[in-house]
Swiss-Prot record:
Provides the (R)-glutamate required for cell wall biosynthesis. It catalyses: L-glutamate = D-glutamate. Signal peptide: none annotated. GO terms for molecular function: glutamate racemase activity. InterPro entries: Asp/Glu/hydantoin_racemase (IPR015942), Asp/Glu_race (IPR001920), Asp/Glu_racemase_AS_1 (IPR018187), Glu_race (IPR004391). Its EC number is 5.1.1.3. Substrate binds at D7, S8, Y39, G40, N71, T72, T195, H196. The active site is at C70 (proton donor/acceptor), C194 (proton donor/acceptor). It comes from the Bacteria. Keywords: Cell shape, Cell wall biogenesis/degradation, Isomerase, Peptidoglycan synthesis. The lineage of its organism: Bacteria, Pseudomonadati, Pseudomonadota, Alphaproteobacteria, Rhodobacterales. The keyword Cell wall biogenesis/degradation applies. It comes from Dinoroseobacter shibae (strain DSM 16493 / NCIMB 14021 / DFL 12). This is Glutamate racemase. The keyword Cell inner membrane does not apply.
Length: 273
């Protein structure tokens, strides 16, 4: 009954932590493609090939349902995967859906025409690849009209977090927020469009100001997954053991992951498919 969680590196651990707390009875298998991280500077074809390989590995681990806890993969690969690659007995879900549900206050199954929503000015902070894909704006446009989205590519932040350099990460976040606010001085809401960024949520909030509502994905994804599994209990795979897989150095990744989650995490090495 295992569920897979995939990320290019360690950022998806924020999602894993939230879904594990929300669904303690479900075993989760986490796959971090640390060898190829970060994805945010790769082109769409490269991201697609790496993501399909990772998802295939999680299927081999008995996870019929896989969460792409990586915004770059969700933006650059998910639609193509769902349209032409994922078999009918498997599911791959991305992390944009819960964000857009929260922002527009309407369910994903609601296919009525787009309508006006309360929030008009949204700041999007994401990797360069996610920003260039315009996937968030495209999905939002299906459900809402009249929303001005200003996107800021946050180069360097993921690398700093993966390296454990939180001082550099904070400086970069403040610089990126300042750059965005020169173009959109008064955003009403901010989307942290990378699963690494919740680790810096307090810094984003401080730099943006207390009056800006900051949407972070981990809790939203956890609630969305719980709802999905209630409606589709058959998508719990045959895998029964939780685990942590990495294409990187397992000792180094384990040490960093333990620092991330403040509990002992042990990864085992796998070869990328």
């Amino acid at each position: 009954m295992a569920v897979g969680v995939f990320d290019s590196g360690l950022g998806g651990l924020t999602v894993l932590d939230a879904v594990s707390r929300r669904l303690p009875e479900v075993p989760f298998v986490y796959y971090g493609d640390n060898l190829h991280a970060p994805y945010g500077v790769r082109d769409a074809e490269d991201v697609y090939e790496l993501t399909t390989g990772a998802v295939s590995r999680l299927w081999d681990e008995g996870c019929d349902l896989v969460i792409l806890a990586c915004n770059t993969a969700s933006a650059a690969a998910l639609r193509r995967m769902q349209e032409s690659w994922v078999p009918s007995d498997k599911r791959v879900l991305g992390v944009f859906v819960p964000l857009i549900e929260a922002l527009t206050e309407r369910q994903w199954g609601d296919n009525s025409p787009p309508r006006e929503v309360a929030i008009k000015h949204v700041a999007l902070f994401a990797t360069p690849a996610t920003v260039s894909s315009r996937a968030f704006q495209r999905e939002l446009a299906f459900r809402a009209i009249g929303v001005d989205v200003e996107a800021q590519p946050c180069g360097g932040v993921v690398d700093a977090i993966e390296d454990g350099d939180m001082i550099l990460a904070e400086a970069l976040v403040r610089s990126h927020v300042e750059a965005l606010k020169r173009r959109m001085p008064h955003p009403e809401a901010a989307i942290l469009g990378c699963t690494h960024y919740p680790l810096m949520q307090d810094v984003f909030q401080d730099a943006l100001g207390a009056d800006v509502k900051v949407y972070s994905q981990a809790q939203l994804v956890a609630e969305s997954l719980a709802d999905y599994l209630t409606r589709h209990p058959d998508m719990l795979g045959l895998g029964a053991e939780p685990g942590f897989l990495t294409t990187g150095d397992p000792k180094s990744v384990s040490n960093k992951a333990t620092q991330f989650l403040r509990r002992k995490i042990e990864f085992r090495a796998v070869e990328p498919l």
